[in-house]
């Protein structure tokens, strides 16, 4: 049993690996956490994590630069139905396409476009940076027993774009930043968070623990 964190030149790999290792240690049978650029290791993994920071097009280019990586992701997640966790731009890459400066194809696991957030208040600046609560949209095992809502724990966001999903059923939670912002998506065995769980302290560790325990 292993968890593969994909290294494609984007993402807080060290922070993500440490957070997943810490969450894994709390489990009865911890799964080894592996940071890898090897598509074969991704294909053999029991769970896959795709972090990402920066521009959508740059992150997609980084994935494409590793021969066989996109195929390995599709076969592992879509065909073999292994649990997948996309973080920040890693979550955005689950969309049909990104529209950050240029239109770029995503993995097309969740129908929708990645578009710029548009707060309806002038005092709210872009990027959306800092702590925010989550409003649940539908139940999901990865969100089970997490304190959500206006009095819940906070998650840490740093982003200017979000995934505007075509189907409401693919949205698990939203944040409010002068309007609704997609915070968590989920479909089949894949989930994604716009915020950074590895920077979200107790809330983030609880979420990662739920993902590691999840048996879809």
UniProtKB/Swiss-Prot annotation:
Gene3D superfamilies: 3.40.50.880. The keyword Glycoprotein does not apply. It is found in: Cytoplasm. Its EC number is 4.3.2.10, 3.5.1.2. Its main location: cytoplasm. It catalyses: 5-[(5-phospho-1-deoxy-D-ribulos-1-ylimino)methylamino]-1-(5-phospho-beta-D-ribosyl)imidazole-4-carboxamide + L-glutamine = D-erythro-1-(imidazol-4-yl)glycerol 3-phosphate + 5-amino-1-(5-phospho-beta-D-ribosyl)imidazole-4-carboxamide + L-glutamate + H(+); L-glutamine + H2O = L-glutamate + NH4(+). Keywords: Amino-acid biosynthesis, Cytoplasm, Glutamine amidotransferase, Histidine biosynthesis, Hydrolase, Lyase. Pathway: Amino-acid biosynthesis; L-histidine biosynthesis; L-histidine from 5-phospho-alpha-D-ribose 1-diphosphate: step 5/9. HAMAP family: HisH (MF_00278). Heterodimer of HisH and HisF. IGPS catalyzes the conversion of PRFAR and glutamine to IGP, AICAR and glutamate. The HisH subunit catalyzes the hydrolysis of glutamine to glutamate and ammonia as part of the synthesis of IGP and AICAR. The resulting ammonia molecule is channeled to the active site of HisF. NCBIfam families: IMP_synth_hisH. This is Imidazole glycerol phosphate synthase subunit HisH. It comes from Rhodopseudomonas palustris (strain ATCC BAA-98 / CGA009).
């Amino acid at each position: 049993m292993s968890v593969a964190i994909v290294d494609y030149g984007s993402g807080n790999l060290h922070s993500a690996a440490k957070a997943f290792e810490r969450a894994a240690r709390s489990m009865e049978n911890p799964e080894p956490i592996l940071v890898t650029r090897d598509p074969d290791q991704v294909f053999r993994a029991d769970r896959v994590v795709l972090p990402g920071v920066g521009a959508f097009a740059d992150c997609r280019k980084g994935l494409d630069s590793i021969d066989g990586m996109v195929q390995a992701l599709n076969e592992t997640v879509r065909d073999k139905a292994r649990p997948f966790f996309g973080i920040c731009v890693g979550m955005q890459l689950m969309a049909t396409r990104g529209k950050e400066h240029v239109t770029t194809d995503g993995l097309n696991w969740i129908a929708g476009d990645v578009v710029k957030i548009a707060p309806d208040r002038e005092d709210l600046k872009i990027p959306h940076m800092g702590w925010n609560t989550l409003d649940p949209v539908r139940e999901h095992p990865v969100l089970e027993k997490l304190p959500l809502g206006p009095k819940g724990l906070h998650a840490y966001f740093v982003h200017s774009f979000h995934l505007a999903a075509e189907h409401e059923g693919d949205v698990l939670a939203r944040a409010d930043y002068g309007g609704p912002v997609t915070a968590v998506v989920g479909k089949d065995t894949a989930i994604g968070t716009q915020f950074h769980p590895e920077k979200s302290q107790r809330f983030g560790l609880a979420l990662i623990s739920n993902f590691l325990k999840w048996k879809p």
